[in-house]
Amino acid sequence: MPSDSSAKPGAAGINGRRNFLTSGAAAAAALATAGVATHAAAAPAINPYADPAKPMLPPSTMQLDLSRTALVVIDPQVDFLSPKGVAWGAVGASVQQHNTVENLSRLFAAAKANDVTVAVSPHHYYPTDKGWKFEGALEKLMHKIGMFNRLSPYSMEGFENSGADFMPQYKQHILDNKTIIASPHKVYGPEQNDLVLQLRKNRIDQVVLAGMSANLCVESHLRALLEGGFEVAVVRDATAAAILPEGDGYLAALTNFRFIANAVWTTGETVARLSARG
């Protein structure tokens, strides 16, 4: 586990963590991407993310009532979505392929323009989170590279423009004193933060889900919200995931989105639905 000093989001620490991921996970991601590219060259008609030509599952019938709908964006933070972030070596190719950063901007803008409730579920780690006695594989990696590090829950020192901060282009939408900023989740799902409470207190029971990363926090939020009685649509190109030798996180998530979400939409489809008030 890193020492307390590794929790400081200084330039040297960030560069060191980025170099770790660049030399390790980033290289693995490049190999995996190269493999996909080679396969695509041999069979250009195959898109692993394309919808099936003959689906067996029944189509979605979800219709938004914007008075009880919220756009929920998970982890719209620098460490996931910026080339400056420590996870970029693993997720960057997927983020770029799906145009995730720009698509999230479109969703924020559409929701705000149409007075749709917006909530953010962020991911933060404090020095006291570094002493956990057991962790899953991705937890170990996140802590090793210093992902989402903050010095304290009560101090903003070193936070602005750090990997834990929100992406700059989203701040106008998030920091408007209207967006619900839930308390941080710690692993993947919202079970340990106040997102569900905030949604229920605002009489929200329909959720449009987007953010990072697809097979981890987004899928975990999806499952928890469904189990909690919410109707949930996932925006398939407003998320992304790591591509590693262990697997393509985006493809894994997309499969489960199709199986369990109430709807799976593109950003274009979602913007149109968010703009259909009245």
Regions found by a protein language model. Name each.
Residues G85-A111, V116-T117:
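A short alpha/beta connector and helix-capping loop motif
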Residues V72-I74:
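Short hydrophobic beta-strand that contains or immediately precedes a catalytic carboxylate
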Residues V116-H123, V235:
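Short beta-strand segments at enzyme active-site cores
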Residues Y126-K130:
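Short catalytic/ligand-binding loop motif for oxyanion handling, primarily in non-cytosolic enzymes
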Residues A37-A40:
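N-terminal signal peptide c-region/cleavage motif recognized by signal peptidases
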Residues P83-G92, K133-F134, L225:
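Surface-exposed, active-site-proximal loop segments in enzymatic domains
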Residues P2-A27, A42-A70, D79, A110-N114, ...:
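Active-site-adjacent betaalpha module
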Residues P76-K84:
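Oxyanion-hole/transition-state-stabilizing segment in secreted/luminal serine hydrolases
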